């Protein structure tokens, strides 16, 4: 789903993607960075900079993450190694700089744990006051997907998410209440495959792996 978010953001005519920060969750940060660089190159947008975020010591993805997303995080699809590298600047520093430079034109869209966002808020209090966030995570009126009380992104670093909510001035939470109503089927992936492009096939393969996994875990 994060790979699709990248693709849709790049394709949207009214959006300019100025950078991507990679975090842990379904995979480790180094693997997330490699995947992001490879996907941007696949989408002919390898000029977009990628920044590595922080990660807890000894982090290992869960077995259920590997089952749903594949051990490589992209449905076991083999992506050609990217020819570019991540930026040396830490992700939190990039976000702080971007908010100062872009102002109200910038919207940050976290789709993983809140660790990087909380780090930026702690490093620069003005980041919390001036950033606009639309985050994927949480569950308000429905059960969680890790435990009945916990959603996957929030559960990775609940302390960071608590810090975010305590200090943010403008955050929209898009939780399971919304995302569970958003359906993607093999009809859509079939249309991508039918384009005959390399990117279309890659994204169809990724999504169909995801669909098969959820057909097992959530057959309803």
Residue ranges of model-derived segments:
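N-terminal acidic, glycine/proline-rich low-complexity segments
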Residues: 1-220
């Amino acid at each position: 789903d994060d790979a699709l978010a990248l693709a849709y953001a790049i394709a949207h005519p009214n959006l300019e993607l100025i950078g991507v920060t990679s975090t842990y969750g379904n995979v480790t940060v180094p693997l997330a960075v490699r995947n992001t660089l490879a996907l941007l190159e696949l989408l002919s947008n390898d000029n977009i900079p990628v920044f590595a975020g922080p990660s807890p010591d000894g982090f290992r993805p869960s077995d259920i993450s590997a089952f749903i997303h594949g051990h490589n995080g992209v449905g076991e699809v083999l992506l050609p190694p990217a020819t570019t590298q991540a930026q040396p600047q830490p992700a939190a520093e990039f976000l702080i700089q971007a908010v100062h430079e872009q102002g109200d034109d910038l919207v940050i869209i976290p789709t993983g744990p809140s660790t990087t966002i909380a780090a930026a808020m702690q490093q620069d209090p003005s980041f919390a006051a001036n950033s606009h966030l639309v985050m994927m995570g949480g569950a308000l009126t429905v059960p969680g997907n890790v435990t009945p009380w916990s959603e996957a992104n929030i559960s990775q670093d609940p302390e960071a998410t608590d810090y975010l909510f305590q200090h943010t001035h403008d955050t929209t939470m898009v939780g399971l209440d919304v995302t569970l109503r958003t359906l993607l089927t093999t009809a859509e992936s079939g249309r991508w495959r039918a384009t005959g492009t390399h990117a279309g096939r890659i994204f169809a393969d990724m999504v169909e792996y995801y669909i098969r996994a959820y057909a097992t875990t959530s057959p309803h």
